């Protein structure tokens, strides 16, 4: 399941493009997530009042949270050695927000689609496969941590 050095390099090169506009990418990821899986919006009290795509596009709270979501880059930069970063994240997601692992899959899909849309020429099959593996590693490790906190997610 682990990634080799070349795969990690592909992931981090792509993530550098994401970080060049973290707010824009993060907002696009949340927009795609909520459009594809509207049930996920129930986990976000501050977004429940947003009913239309225009309201979502204009939401400053949603833009800010998009940046927060994409701090995932800090975990990716650890190349799988992310125990210290993952523990507090998994604890809040398991015990406070109660985010099911399935929702982590949904947001991973949204991340992949947004990167593919915004960076099609740089996100070929190899880079996509590497990113998919990195996000899967993240999700699997989150799921393991969830169990440590007694959340089956």
Swiss-Prot record:
Reaction catalysis annotation: Fe(III)-heme b-[protein] + nitric oxide + H2O = Fe(II)-heme b-[protein] + nitrite + 2 H(+); H2O2 + AH2 = A + 2 H2O
Annotated binding of O2, by residue: 65
Top-rank taxon: Eukaryota
Broad class of where this protein is predominantly found: cytoplasm
Name of the protein in question: Myoglobin
UniProt keyword Transferase present: no
Gene3D superfamilies, sorted: 6.10.140.2100, 6.10.140.2110
Cellular component terms per the entry's GO annotation: extracellular exosome; sarcoplasm
Organism (species): Aptenodytes forsteri (Emperor penguin)
């Amino acid at each position: 399941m682990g990634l080799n050095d070349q795969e990690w390099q592909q992931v981090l090169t792509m993530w550098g493009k994401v970080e060049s506009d973290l707010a824009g990418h993060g907002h696009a990821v949340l927009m795609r997530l909520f459009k594809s899986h509207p049930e996920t919006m129930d986990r976000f009290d501050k977004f429940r009042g947003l009913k239309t795509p225009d309201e979502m596009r204009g939401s400053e709270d949603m833009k800010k949270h998009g940046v927060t979501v994409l701090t995932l880059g800090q975990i990716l930069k650890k190349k799988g050695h992310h125990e210290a970063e993952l523990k507090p994240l998994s604890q809040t997601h398991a015990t406070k927000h109660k985010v099911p692992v399935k929702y982590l899959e949904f947001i991973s899909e949204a991340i992949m689609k947004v990167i593919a849309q915004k960076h099609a020429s740089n996100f070929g099959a190899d880079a996509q496969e590497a990113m998919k593996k990195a996000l899967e590693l993240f999700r699997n490790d989150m799921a393991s941590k969830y169990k440590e906190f007694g959340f089956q997610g």
